[in-house]
């Protein structure tokens, strides 16, 4: 199974690459829109700034290519990659996300330390991922998604309850605010479920 890891000037590509390879798949890091056509799944990773990432996706033509692939192969957004699935972000109001889901990204509450960094639990709402309910995953973020659509699959508590997993199984699209590739065996298992389970 060929998994395209989208390169758009953000961090954590190596850890995602290693995780995909560990799962027995063929990872390909690319910023070439045409290469996404040959992939069996696409991962939009990321740690960084919403504006810089959105601009790079637009400049390279990756935005249009990713939108064209929606529903044909599994798409997973991780951390900033999940936030880019939304229409916009308070971090950079003038920048446009992919608009896969309606809604925006907002800052975490002022009364908690940011970034939210470290291990935290996820309460899953869906039977699809029930075996992972209450498990610990690794987070690093200062913003969180605020979707208008009914796409929340899991929530986490950090000053408030926020969506930590979103998705639309019918369109093969998922987003995770945490880093499954840095979350030990449980995270790797969840990553594998999304990459292969969504394509079944």
Curated annotation (Swiss-Prot):
CDD domains: GATase1_IGP_Synthase. The active site is at residues 79, 179, 181. Gene3D superfamilies: 3.40.50.880. It is found in: Cytoplasm. One of its GO terms (molecular function) is imidazoleglycerol-phosphate synthase activity. Keywords: Amino-acid biosynthesis, Cytoplasm, Glutamine amidotransferase, Histidine biosynthesis, Hydrolase, Lyase. SUPFAM superfamilies: Class I glutamine amidotransferase-like. Pathway: Amino-acid biosynthesis; L-histidine biosynthesis; L-histidine from 5-phospho-alpha-D-ribose 1-diphosphate: step 5/9. The keyword ATP-binding does not apply. It catalyses: 5-[(5-phospho-1-deoxy-D-ribulos-1-ylimino)methylamino]-1-(5-phospho-beta-D-ribosyl)imidazole-4-carboxamide + L-glutamine = D-erythro-1-(imidazol-4-yl)glycerol 3-phosphate + 5-amino-1-(5-phospho-beta-D-ribosyl)imidazole-4-carboxamide + L-glutamate + H(+); L-glutamine + H2O = L-glutamate + NH4(+). Its EC number is 4.3.2.10, 3.5.1.2. Residues 2-200 form the Glutamine amidotransferase type-1 domain. Its main location: cytoplasm. One of its GO terms (cellular component) is cytoplasm. Disulfide bonds: none annotated. One of its GO terms (biological process) is L-histidine biosynthetic process. Pfam families: GATase. HAMAP family: HisH (MF_00278). IGPS catalyzes the conversion of PRFAR and glutamine to IGP, AICAR and glutamate. The HisH subunit catalyzes the hydrolysis of glutamine to glutamate and ammonia as part of the synthesis of IGP and AICAR. The resulting ammonia molecule is channeled to the active site of HisF. Heterodimer of HisH and HisF. This is Imidazole glycerol phosphate synthase subunit HisH. The gene is hisH.
């Amino acid at each position: 199974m060929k998994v395209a890891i989208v390169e758009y000037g953000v961090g954590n590509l190596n850890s995602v690459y290693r995780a995909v390879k560990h799962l027995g798949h063929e990872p390909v890091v690319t910023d070439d829109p045409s290469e996404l056509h040959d992939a069996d799944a696409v991962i939009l990773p990321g740690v960084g700034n919403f504006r810089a990432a959105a601009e790079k996706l637009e400049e390279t033509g990756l935005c249009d290519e990713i939108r064209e692939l929606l529903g044909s192969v599994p798409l997973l957004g991780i951390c900033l990659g999940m936030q880019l699935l939304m229409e916009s972000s308070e971090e950079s109001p003038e920048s446009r996300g992919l608009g896969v889901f309606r809604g925006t990204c907002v800052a975490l509450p002022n009364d908690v330390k940011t970034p939210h960094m470290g291990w935290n639990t996820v309460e899953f709402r869906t039977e699809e991922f029930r075996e992972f309910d209450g498990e610990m995953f690794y987070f690093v973020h200062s913003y969180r998604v605020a979707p208008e659509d009914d796409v929340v699959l899991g929530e986490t508590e950090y000053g408030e309850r926020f969506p930590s997993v979103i998705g639309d199984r019918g369109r093969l699209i998922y987003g995770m605010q945490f880093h499954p590739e840095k979350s030990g065996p449980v995270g790797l298992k969840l990553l594998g479920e999304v990459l292969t389970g969504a394509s079944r």
